[in-house]
Amino acid sequence: NMVLVSRDGQQWSPPPLASLEHRADLPHTGLAQVLTSAYNGADWRRNILWVKERFFVVFDEVQAREAGDYDLECLWRSLGRVSLSPTRFTVDQAGQDFSIEGTDGAACVVREQWEGQGSNYYASYPYSNDGLVKVLRQHRRLPLQAGQRAVFSNLLHTHEGAAPTLKAERVADNAMLISGASGKWLAGVGRIDLPGVLRTDAALWLVSDSD
């Protein structure tokens, strides 16, 4: 599960090391930001916001260090029966479902991938019907000047049955509204000004209408 970055048609391996920029482990939430620097002309920040026992929100920010035409892919790997709508990727593992819902408008496709050398590596996994890895590929291609950025924003959560129990809506490139029967949450990264609602420049932030 990662972001692939290429610039002007060239792609090199990601840097071998990443830095933990921020972390917090609170009673009801967890927050983390990891930075991969100088990755094919850009910096990649993975921001993870965790509402414990409920969901994860992941913002992947790619900020250009150098101007160029960027080709970006955010990859998510899973096992089981999958379905794909324009905004949601759902995995069924024997009645236990998992969804990834994007709010950034990236084009999405699912590819099947065989793992192992000459054998089905995941054939014995009890919650995979065929042993194939299903890879969700979220794709964006765009020109970026130095300092500009592109963001992949995704809500990840589990649910019993095919119908997701949460809904994600785009508020801004760096902010998402999550709604469910148990409440609403506003999650984001970096500076935002929502008149009458929220103004902050925190690296990662999360507010709710309950706890």
Walk through the language-model features, giving the residues of each.
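CBM-like, beta-strand-rich accessory domains located in the C-terminal region of large
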Residues: N1-D211
